[in-house]
Regions:
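Intrinsic low-complexity, intrinsically disordered or marginally ordered coil/linker segments
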Residues: 2-152
Length: 152
C-alpha cells in the first residue's frame, strides 16, 4: 500500500521516458501499446521446460462494425493454472478483447530443437493441437514439432 500511496510523488520525480523504461525493465506493459492486432505476437511461450498453454482468440473492433480476430498461443511456467495465463494475457492486451479457447501442455527442448504439444486444460478443455502446432512451427521453423492427445 505504501508504494501505491507514494506513486504520485514518485511519478512526479521521474520523467515519463524513465518511467516507461522502469516498467519495461520489470516486465510491465503499458496497455495503450496493444491497440491493434498487428502488434500482438502470435506465439509467446517460455524458452524451455514443460508448462501449460492456452489458445486465445483476440478481437479488435473496427469502425465498420466487424471484429477481425487472430488466434494466439501463450504458455508460461510461472502460471500454475491455464486461467492464470488467460488473466495475464487479457490484462496485457487490453483494450483488445480476448476469448480463451482451450489449453494443454508444451514440452520445449531448445537444445534438441523440439517442441511437444499434448494434454488438455481441466478448465478450458483440450486445445486443437494441430492449430497450436501450426502457429508454433511458424515461430520456430527450425524445430521439430510433435503433438499427442495423450497425457495431462
Amino acid at each position: 500500500m505504501y508504494i501505491v500511496y507514494q506513486m504520485p510523488r514518485i511519478l512526479s520525480t521521474l520523467c515519463q521516458s524513465s518511467f516507461k523504461r522502469l516498467l519495461t525493465h520489470h516486465n510491465f506493459q503499458l496497455n495503450n501499446n496493444m491497440s491493434s492486432l498487428s502488434s500482438v505476437p502470435l506465439v509467446d511461450i517460455d524458452p524451455s521446460g514443460v508448462f501449460k498453454y492456452i489458445l486465445i482468440n483476440v478481437y479488435e473492433e473496427v469502425k465498420s462494425g466487424q471484429e477481425p480476430k487472430i488466434t494466439i498461443v501463450r504458455g508460461y511456467k510461472r502460471c500454475n493454472y491455464h486461467s492464470d495465463i488467460y488473466d495475464e494475457v487479457q490484462a496485457k492486451l487490453s483494450p483488445l478483447d480476448c476469448e480463451p479457447l482451450a489449453g494443454g501442455r508444451i514440452s520445449h527442448d531448445p537444445e534438441n530443437k523440439k517442441i511437444h504439444i499434448y494434454g488438455y486444460s481441466q478448465g478450458y478443455g483440450k486445445a486443437d493441437h494441430e492449430v497450436t502446432a501450426k502457429l508454433i512451427k511458424a515461430a520456430y521453423p527450425e524445430y521439430t514439432i510433435t503433438i499427442s492427445d495423450e497425457g495431462y
